Each structure stands twice: as C-alpha cells, then as structure tokens.
Amino acid sequence: CIRDSKNGLSDGYPDDFRAKIASYALTADYHATIKGMLGDLFGRLRAAEPALAGRAFVDSAPLVEKQLAVEAGLGWIGRQSLLVTPRFGSFVLLGELVLDAACDRYDEPLAGVGCGSCRRCVEACPTGAVCNDRAIDARRCISCHTIERTPAAEIALDGWIFGCDACQSRCPYNLRAPLHLHPAFDPLFDPLSFPPERWLAMEEAESVSYTHLTLPTT
C-alpha cells in the first residue's frame, strides 16, 4: 500500500535557510503510524475470514518495496530512484500486508506513464547525487550522509540537517500533488522557527521530543 504524505514544507525551504529537515521527518514516526493502519485493515479482513494469516511490514523486512509497488501498478521508479505515483508523486510512504491467501485478481504495472524527458530532479540535486540510471550515488547524497551517526565532511550539505527533499521538491508530479488529509502526517512543529543555533544547543532527547529524528553527531 502507499500513503500520501505531502505537507506544507514538501515544496521546499527558502534558499537561505540553514536548518532544513526532510518533510517526512517532521511528523510522528510513520513506521508506527502505517503499521497501525495495516493492523486495522488486517483486523477487518480477519473479521470476514477468521482463518486468514498475515503480517504487516513497514521498512521491517527484506522486501523490495519499490519494485513490488511498481508491479502492483502503483507507480514507476523515477530518475531519483524513488517510487513516483501519478496522483501523489513521490511524497508517499510504503507499507505491506502479506497474507497467506490468493486474491481474486492482481493489478498490473502502469503503462504509458513515467518521467519522459524530464530531468528536474537531476538538475535540482545540489551535490549531483542523482545518476542517469535511476539510481543515487550514496557517497554524494545529502540524505544518506545526514541520517548517519557520523556524516562525512567532504560534501556541502546545502543547509540540510536531516534528510533532503531537493530532488523531490522540483518534480512536476510532486508540485501538483495534493496535501495529505490525515492528521497523523501533520508536522509536529514548524522548522522555520528553529534557527541552526537552537538545534546546535539541543540535547538529543529534546530533538527526539519534537520528531522521530535523531540528529547525527559531528
């Protein structure tokens, strides 16, 4: 399944802002939220079919989530290596409910849609981490660096302190995607009111109280 997650900061920050946080990290931990949603769905299915067995996963099993989503007709892999959906763009969160029963029918991959000749995500990446083969160079990706405990110092972070939405914020599908409608995905605070100095003076326990992120050490 996919869950749209675009919020008011998904379209980007002011150019001179120096404490940017990826929009997904501004919310409550989506792993727990989506797993709870899948659990509720499984409960309804079990009410109709008591013998049904299954298990929910959200980044918690070695499943090729993006490829499964493509095969299910939910979207395609964009140039920035993320799943892109026709309605919600790439600001979506993935979860799976694996069951021991066959379905009456299965969806097929989408046809006639994709990124075409668009290269906005490639051009938007401040470090050139978006490759031409729908892959990311993790050595140059700001998001990869800032979610590690000891981020490398050899790349400029362009004001990002956790994650990076640069390649997504320029995507035409994302620009016209609607904002999410579920309160569980609302930002827990306004990062624009937090200057870099406030984050630098903050203990880890306090940062976790604002969101589920853990700021990397320097």
Language-model segments: which ranges?
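Auxiliary alpha/beta "docking" domains used to position bulky ligands
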Residues: 2-114, 158
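Electrostatic cytochrome c docking/interface patches
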Residues: 152-156
